[in-house]
């Protein structure tokens, strides 16, 4: 996408401007031309790919998309195994191999056993997709602590365990990709979903922090991403999940409108997330988006066309806090250095720089 107000497809901009121009990426709720499966057929042939939470809607779609790309699939589940037809579907789509492994990612021992088994049987791991998730809706002060702790264990501890176990392997082979399925809930505050929001926010920042460490070591071929998979109808997003809350909030007169709005929020195809993950796993965006938070509903081609804009602003596609007047997170204003504010205050008072407690 290019035009009078858009950067070229190479991501360059007029050097006379202070900042690269930006335009809003196109929005999608289904697979679009840039990530069509036929473009990636066989692109990940024989790449050993672990997908956690493979029994759910998002997990099955991920498996099918990576099958098209020719990956060797290791599909994990905990309580509910994937449907028996999933293996056949994936093989028919082009998967190099498909195996199922029972694993509770909330437990370190389970993650250790999984990694050991995969390395013994496959000899390597190329791609890790942390997709398993848990969400226990409820009032924070009445919800059992066990529910909150379980959400942290599945949504944060599990990805941490597997990343921690596989990172030395990725470093030694100088390649590897981690796709952490986070959520937009990790970027906003949502009532009655405290554990989910908190754990997903932590997952987004965990991804960014680990990528920073890899970049320091110039291990750019080990690339990590956190993603909002879109609004997808699944067991976790059924309106029945929120019915207990409607007995408390909001008032009964708004229940119908509330449930209808809840339904319309979840109309994205799970294959939109699946094919975005395939595209990222090939490395086509690692020069721009590694370590970043990606909303799969945004056109990836449009994002890549603005590579320079993203590189010039570390707050893009990242968790970010804003303050009044452009005050930066380090406590300084735009163009200021730490301590400048104290100097200004002292000058205004006609005194010296500095302050002696308690000052009266």
Which stretches of residues belong to each language-model region?
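Active-site loop-to-helix junction immediately N-terminal to the catalytic Tyr of the SDR YXXXK motif
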Residues: 143, 189-197, 209
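Conserved glycine-rich cofactor-binding loop
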Residues: 48, 55-56
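Substrate-binding pocket helix/loop in short-chain dehydrogenase/reductase
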Residues: 139-152
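Conserved glycine-rich Rossmann-like NAD(P)H-binding loop of the short-chain dehydrogenase/reductase
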Residues: 69-85
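C-terminal helical subdomain
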Residues: 7-34, 226, 246-360
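Active-site helix of classical SDR
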Residues: 163, 199
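Residue(s) in the substrate-gating loop at a strand-loop-helix junction
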Residues: 183
């Amino acid at each position: 996408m290019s035009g009078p107000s858009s950067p070229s497809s190479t991501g360059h901009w007029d050097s006379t401007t202070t900042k690269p121009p930006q335009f809003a990426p196109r929005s999608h709720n289904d697979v679009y031309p840039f990530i069509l499966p036929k473009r990636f057929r066989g692109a990940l042939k024989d790449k050993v790919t672990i997908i956690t939470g493979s029994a759910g809607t998002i997990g099955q779609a991920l498996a099918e998309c990576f099958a098209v790309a020719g990956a060797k699939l290791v599909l994990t589940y905990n309580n509910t195994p994937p449907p028996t037809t999933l293996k056949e579907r994936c093989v028919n789509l082009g998967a190099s191999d498909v195996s199922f492994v029972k694993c509770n990612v909330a437990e370190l021992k389970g993650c250790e056993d999984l990694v050991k088994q995969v390395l013994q049987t496959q000899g390597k791991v190329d791609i890790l997709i942390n997709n398993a998730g848990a969400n226990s809706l409820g009032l924070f002060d009445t919800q059992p602590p066990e529910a909150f702790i379980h959400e942290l264990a599945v949504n944060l501890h599990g990805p941490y365990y597997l990343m921690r176990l596989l990172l030395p392997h990725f470093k030694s082979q100088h390649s590897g990709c981690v796709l952490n399925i986070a959520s937009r809930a990790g970027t906003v505050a949502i009532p009655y979903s405290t554990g989910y929001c908190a754990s997903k926010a932590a997952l987004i920042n965990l991804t960014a922090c680990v990528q920073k460490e890899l970049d320091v070591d110039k291990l750019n071929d080990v690339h990590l991403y956190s993603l909002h998979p879109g609004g997808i109808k699944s067991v976790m997003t059924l309106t029945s999940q929120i019915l207990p809350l409607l007995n408390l909030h909001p008032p009964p007169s708004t229940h119908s409108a509330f449930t209808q709005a809840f339904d319309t929020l979840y109309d994205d195809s799970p294959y939109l997330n699946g094919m975005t993950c395939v595209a990222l796993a090939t490395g086509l965006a690692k020069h721009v988006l590694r370590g970043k938070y990606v909303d799969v509903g945004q056109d990836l081609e449009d994002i890549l066309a603005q590579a320079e804009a993203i590189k010039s602003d570390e707050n893009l596609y990242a968790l970010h806090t804003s303050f009044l007047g452009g005050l930066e997170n380090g406590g300084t204003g735009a163009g200021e250095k730490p301590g400048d504010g104290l100097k200004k205050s002292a000058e205004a008072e006609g005194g010296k720089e500095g302050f002696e407690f308690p000052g009266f």
